Amino acid sequence: MTRQLSFPASRVAVVSITRHGITLAGRVIAALPGARLFVPEKFRAEADAAAAGAVSCYAGKTGDQIPALFASFDGIVCIVSLGAVVRLIAPHLKNKEADPGIVVIDEAGRFVIPMLSGHLGGANALAGCLAEALGATPVLTTASDARQTLAVDLLGRELGWTFEASHDEIVRASAAMVNDEPVALVQEAGGGDWWTRHANGRSGPLPVNLKQFARLEEIDPEAFSAILWVSRRELPAGWAAKLAGKRVIYRPPQDAA
């Protein structure tokens, strides 16, 4: 597997509720060493054959297992119909910052669908890894991934960057990117080839609506719908007001260029 997960494989739960689905689940577990397979007790023998040593069986309803799975895992792979998964998880959803990444795979293993927390929760990255391992088609519906543009909430993640922004600022900057509005990218630190490694990999030139700068002081904030600032310094005096509501600040680790 060449793609990178957003969390350790040991933080992934795989859920399957049918005999044929459990066979596929064995392949998923093989692709994610350390992941755990959850199945109904009646399929214990099939599960042990498919993923020996990685099986947890439960009695009762699958829906009753969801709270514990949400609390214990960062990623949940469901080999269950998409509609059924919607009904199972709906009562337990909080917000995109807290919910785990959830991926759905059809029983034939043809399609891998990140259905919840694609970016912050890592579902898109998990889906990409599994699609590659299974020879399946990843079905990405997030606008930035469908259009292969910049995902504001993932910029620099592969390089260890963190970001500082409110929920509304992320929404505004993300909307500006996917709607082709002018966006400034000011990179004062971090280095690295972040574009080809971005969000499981991008190819070709940068988005045409993204204009690059080397220093924050070079930009006219009024000319841009959003400003993405990669730096280790604090905002210069007076700039907080100029960038209010439309800036995302990225902080590369100290040992980066």
Residue ranges, per PLM feature:
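Extracellular lectin-like interaction modules
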Residues: 46-50
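Short, structured active-site "lid" loops
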Residues: 53-83
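Conserved mixed alpha/beta core segments that line enzyme active sites in large multi-domain catalysts
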Residues: 65-68, 169-173, 217
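An N-terminal, well-structured beta->alpha segment
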Residues: 2-6
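Conserved mixed alpha/beta catalytic, RNA-binding, or beta-rich assembly cores of soluble enzyme
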Residues: 15-34, 39-45, 56-60, 75, ...
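Extreme N-terminal starter segment of soluble prokaryotic enzymes
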Residues: 8-14
